[in-house]
Each structure stands twice: as C-alpha cells, then as structure tokens.
Swiss-Prot record:
Organism: Bacillus velezensis (strain DSM 23117 / BGSC 10A6 / LMG 26770 / FZB42)
SUPFAM superfamilies: Glutamyl tRNA-reductase catalytic, N-terminal domain, Glutamyl tRNA-reductase dimerization domain, NAD(P)-binding Rossmann-fold domains
Gene, per the UniProt record: hemA
Catalysed reaction equations from the record: (S)-4-amino-5-oxopentanoate + tRNA(Glu) + NADP(+) = L-glutamyl-tRNA(Glu) + NADPH + H(+)
Annotated function: Catalyzes the NADPH-dependent reduction of glutamyl-tRNA(Glu) to glutamate 1-semialdehyde (GSA).
Source domain of life: Bacteria
Enzyme Commission numbers on file: 1.2.1.70
One MF term in the entry's GO annotations: NADP binding
A Pfam family of this chain: GlutR_N
Record PANTHER family: GLUTAMYL-TRNA REDUCTASE
The protein's enzyme class: oxidoreductase
Name of the protein in its database record: Glutamyl-tRNA reductase
InterPro entries reported in the protein's UniProt record: 4pyrrol_synth_GluRdtase, 4pyrrol_synth_GluRdtase_dimer, 4pyrrol_synth_GluRdtase_N, GluRdtase_CS, GluRdtase_dimer_dom_sf, GluRdtase_N_sf, NAD(P)-bd_dom_sf, Shikm_DH/Glu-tRNA_Rdtase
Length: 455
C-alpha cells in the first residue's frame, strides 16, 4: 500500500486552470464516494480550496493509482487528460505525508501560516469519515495532521497579524486609496471569505459597508455585525454604481458581474474609479471588466505580491514549525510500521485463546460440579494470566516492527511462537487496510482479551 497525493495548487496552475478543477463543498461527499469505487484506490480524501484541489489516496500500486485518479479528475471535470496533465503535481510515500502536514500547518499556503486551510482539511476529514471513504491509515494520518496544525498555531506566532487572501485584498485597497475612512465598500458574498474581508475592513475606519448575498438573511447577519447595510442580489447593479471598492467571493459557478452590467452601472458613476478584487474560485468577475475605463480589477493571483510583503517574519517562524512536522512524520511512520505487526499479534492472541479455551473445557470435564459462577471466575482468571504472559512478547513484537529489518525479525518471532500459519490467515483477512485495526479491536472485544498497550 502507498500514500499518494495528486492535484493542482496556486504554484502549479494559474487561476484559469484551478477554477476548472475545483470541487464545490456540496460535491465533496459524492466525489469521494465515486473515487472510492475506482480501481487501486483504497482510501481517499479530497481537499479543495480557492488555491488548491488535491486528492489524498491510499493506493495498492503507485502507477495504477496515479492513472485512475487522473482519469477520475478528467471525467469529473470533463477535461481531456492532455489538458490536465501539465498542471498536476504528485507526491508519493514520505513526500506525501510531509506535504499533508505542511498544508495543515499553513506552510504550503500562498499566505504562510494562514489558519483557514486547517479548517478546510479538518472539514474534508470529517466528510470522509462520514462517507466511510477512509480507513485505518488516513484516520491516523489526518488525525496527526490536524494535531500538528493546531500545535503550530498554539505554540508559535505564525498566525500573528493575521494575513489571508481577503486581508491581502484590503491591503491592496489601502495601497491604492491610502485611507479607507470615507470609502464605500461592497462585499459580494457572505461566506467565510466575505466574512474575513469584513473583519479585516472593520479596523480600517471604513466609511460604509454594504453586503450582498444570494440569501438576504445571510447578508443581513454579516452586515449587522459591522454596522453595515444588507441588500439583495437584484440590487447589485445599483450597488455597483455607488461603491468605491468591491470585494467578491460568492462561490458561484458563473460570472456574477458581467461587463455589460458594469457598463450600465458605470453610467451613474460620473467617472469615479472602482477598485474590484475577485477572491473567488471560480471567478465572480468577468476579466473583461478590466477593459472598462475607471475599473481596476484584480483576481486572486494578483494578490501574491501583496501577500509576499507581509511574510518575512512568518518564514522565520516556519523554521520552528518544520521541526514540529519532522517529529510528526517520525511518529506517523513508526505507527505505520506497527500495522504490519497486527496480524502477528492477532495470531499470538488466537493461539493463546485457543489454549485457554481447551484448558477450560478440560477443567469442566474433570470438575463437572462447577457452578456457572465458578466457571466464569476461572475463565476470567485464566484470561488474566494470558494477558500478563502476552504483555512482554507483544511489546517486543511492536518494537521489532519499528526496526529497519522488521520483516526478518518478525518472521523469527512467528517461528518461535509457531504462529506462522495463523498469522498468514490473519494477514489475508487484513489485506484491505480499511478493516485491519477495526477487525483487531473487534476480536479483542469478542474474546475478552484486553488491549495490552495503546495502538
């Protein structure tokens, strides 16, 4: 089994490509379920944001995994493979593990240290758990990714003076206008990005805020938080005639503001310039708006320069975060190595349970007068003896599994306890990694042999 990441991000693909390969939040569950049915894919999680769309997968073979995931993306987005392939990035095995941890910590973001991506990774993780598209390996990997991401923000100041794409949009507006105190800001979209834009604008002493959203109640809720005005979407053209700055992030599939709409609104502006920032993927604002006199349009890729100016301190802090990531990688790989020992431990327990069962049957034949209570008591104590006797061998097996030549050492371990045949049967049962630990824990519960050490 191998861990594989396939996708595009802001470094590998321009926005024109990223917006073609972007999953809407309500598509993720269906997409993960469909990908689960692809050949070679054992587990999968999809993370899709404005700056990246990445498929994380456990595959049985790397080359077939790459092929079927690429095929899935091509078919889902109706894009020929030859158009898609030049922009795809691939991470395999250790590099894939490191990449996920860097993403969760915000080190791979356009804005180093931003916190949004951790929430998006966690959200995709929860969706995958709910849809059962992941199993043993990704449950542990993504749990550790979320943990190291949270540790990053708790133990460093990498998120201080918060910077995000929406914050960068505000910074760009300030550079162009100087002060925002007398400016009318129009926020199009009341989702997370719109909310962040409003929060970043709130401390700038802005003159007026108008929020427009497809759902008026959401627009009103956001506007009320910042003493602004809410309007419905059918009032957009009128609002464009009044605003000085537009920050747009609706998540719509088509352009929300067209060149024709802006031309009509522009007749009422009397030559006043309009600064527009499109932080949505796919884009909300027609790129042709840049052709209009007095309109200054920037999209998410244009914000990279603004973002860069705020990041030097975060880069220095990132060196400390790299140490967190290195430790997390070591911890996960140690855990991953122990997966191979699960069938061995199961076989050892099965053999011990068989001996205990045979012993109990022999006792009951020789002592037929035993009461039900006495039989239960004997069974409990014989299992207790087994647990105590197995403790050290199981700990040793786990230590062996973490060593470089673990395969040979575990083979010798199985020979010593004469459990090779049973371990082979246990391994056959657990070839689908999504069932390995679950089956092991289920067997423990059934037999009454308690876990001796935490998994």
């Amino acid at each position: 089994m191998h861990i594989l990441v396939v996708g595009v991000d802001y470094k590998s693909a321009p926005i024109e490509i990223r917006e073609k390969i972007s999953f809407q939040p309500d598509e993720l569950a269906e997409a993960m379920l469909r990908l689960k049915g692809e050949k070679s894919v054992l587990e999968n999680i999809i993370v899709s944001t404005c700056n990246r769309t990445e498929i994380y997968a456990v595959v049985d073979q790397l080359h077939t995994g790459r092929y079927y995931i690429k095929t899935f993306l091509s078919e889902w987005f109706s894009l020929p493979k030859e158009e898609l392939s030049p922009f795809l990035k691939f991470y395999e095995s250790d590099a894939a593990i490191e990449h996920l941890f860097r993403v969760a910590c915000g080190l791979d973001s356009m804005v180093i240290g931003e916190t949004q991506i951790l929430g998006q990774v966690r959200s995709s993780f929860k969706t995958a758990q709910a849809e059962k598209t992941i199993g043993t390996i990704f449950n542990e990997l993504f749990k550790q990714a979320v943990t190291v991401g949270k540790r990053t923000h708790a133990e460093t100041d990498i998120g201080a003076n918060a910077v995000s794409v929406s914050y960068a949009a505000v910074e760009l507006a300030k550079k162009i206008f100087g002060s925002l105190s007398n400016k009318h800001i129009l926020i199009l979209g009341a989702g997370k990005m719109g909310e962040l834009a409003a929060e970043n604008l709130h401390g700038q002493g802005i003159g007026k805020v108008t929020v427009i959203n497809r759902t008026f109640l959401k627009a009103k809720a956001l506007a009320d938080r910042f003493s602004g005005e809410a309007r419905s979407l059918n009032q957009l053209e009128h609002a464009l005639a009044e605003a000085d700055i537009l920050i747009s992030s609706t998540g719509a599939s088509d352009f929300v503001v067209s060149k024709e709409m802006m031309e009509r609104a522009g007749r009422q502006r009397k030559g006043r310039p309009l600064f527009m920032v499109d932080i949505a993927v796919p884009r909300d604002l027609d790129p042709a708006l840049n052709d209009l006199e007095g309109v200054f349009l920037y999209d998410i890729d244009d914000l990279e320069g603004i973002v860069e100016a705020n990041l030097q301190e975060r880069r220095e802090t990132a060196e400390k975060v790299e140490l967190f990531i290195e430790a997390a990688i070591v911890e996960f790989k140690q855990w991953l190595n122990t997966l191979g020992v699960v069938p061995v431990i199961s076989a050892l327990r099965e053999k011990a349970l068989s001996i205990q069962s045979d012993t109990m049957q022999s006792i009951e034949r020789k002592l037929p007068h035993l009461t039900v209570r006495e039989k239960k008591l004997l069974s409990k104590h014989t299992k207790s003896i087994i647990n105590q006797m197995l403790r050290d061998p199981i700990l040793k097996a786990k230590e062996l599994a973490a060593e470089a030549d673990s395969e040979e050492k575990l083979k010798l371990f199985m020979q010593i306890f004469d459990i090779e045949e049973e371990a082979g049967r246990q391994l056959d049962k657990s070839l689908d990694n999504r069932q390995t630990v679950h089956s092991f824990q289920k067997a423990e519960a059934k037999t009454g042999l308690r876990p001796l050490v935490s998994e």
